[in-house]
């Protein structure tokens, strides 16, 4: 999730937004798909199914809306996401294990994914009250986010195709990025195995807020005087 936030910030800074969205979606689909495979025994499929239905409901509604946010909007949205998640009341009983909440989570996260390129920070909010281990959280979120990235690739694929190929990175660079994401996921799995649940949740939030601050600063810097 953290790697995806940083990667989207970099891609949004150097590529047209539609191309950045599709490229990020492909890389993160590989990363999250591999993460889900590594943790496949811990996936809670009941939650994944509910999130998927919410995704489809949101995609159906968004299919009638053609929008492609600009670079500043994406960077600002990326930076604000961790703070929005952090500012929500801690006693907010959003347990993704409950079907109505799962449907809401699926719809909200895919909408956020299409606007900012990532939905992980918001998805986190819905997992704070769920009775799962850190392995189950990571595994289930990996599948959920893979589905979200598929939706993003489908949504922005048309925009990217119409823009032509001149702004796309070379094939070797794309392959290198995918291989790096797989390597990072493998290392992350080993680190996850050694961490305690409390440490995992505490450090994730701190790092996310720090990255968010950098992205907000970048968006403000790009704003016209």
Per-range role (PLM):
Residues 1-6, 116-120, 139:
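Hydrophobic alpha-helical segments that either span membranes
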Residues 4-8, 24-27:
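Short amphipathic alpha-helical segments
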Residues 5-17, 34, 38-113, 124, ...:
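Juxtamembrane transmembrane-helix boundary motif
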Residues 21-36:
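Alpha-helical membrane segments and adjacent membrane-interface helices in multi-pass membrane proteins
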Residues 30, 50, 54, 58, ...:
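Alpha-helical transmembrane segments of multi-pass membrane proteins
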Residues 136-158, 170-173:
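Hydrophobic alpha-helical transmembrane segments of multi-pass integral membrane proteins
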């Amino acid at each position: 999730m953290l790697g995806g936030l940083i990667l989207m910030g970099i891609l949004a800074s150097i590529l047209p937004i539609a191309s950045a969205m599709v490229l990020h979606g492909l890389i993160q689909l590989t990363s999250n798909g591999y993460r889900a495979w590594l943790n496949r025994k811990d996936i809670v499929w009941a939650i994944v199914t509910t999130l998927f239905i919410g995704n489809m409901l949101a995609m159906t509604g968004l299919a009638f809306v053609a929008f492609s946010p600009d670079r500043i909007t994406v960077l600002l949205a990326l930076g604000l996401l961790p703070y929005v998640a952090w500012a929500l009341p801690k006693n907010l009983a959003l347990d993704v294990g409950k079907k109505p909440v799962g449907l809401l989570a699926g719809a909200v996260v895919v909408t956020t994914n299409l606007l900012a390129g990532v939905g992980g920070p918001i998805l986190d909010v819905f997992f704070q009250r769920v009775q799962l281990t850190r392995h189950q959280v990571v595994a289930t979120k990996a599948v959920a986010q893979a589905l979200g990235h598929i939706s993003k690739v489908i949504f922005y694929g048309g925009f990217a195709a119409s823009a032509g190929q001149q702004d796309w990175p070379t094939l070797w660079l794309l392959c290198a990025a995918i291989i790096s994401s797989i390597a990072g996921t493998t290392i992350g799995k080993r680190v996850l195995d050694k961490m305690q649940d409390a440490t995992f949740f505490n450090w994730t939030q701190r790092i996310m807020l720090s990255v968010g601050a950098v992205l907000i600063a970048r968006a403000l810097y790009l704003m016209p005087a």
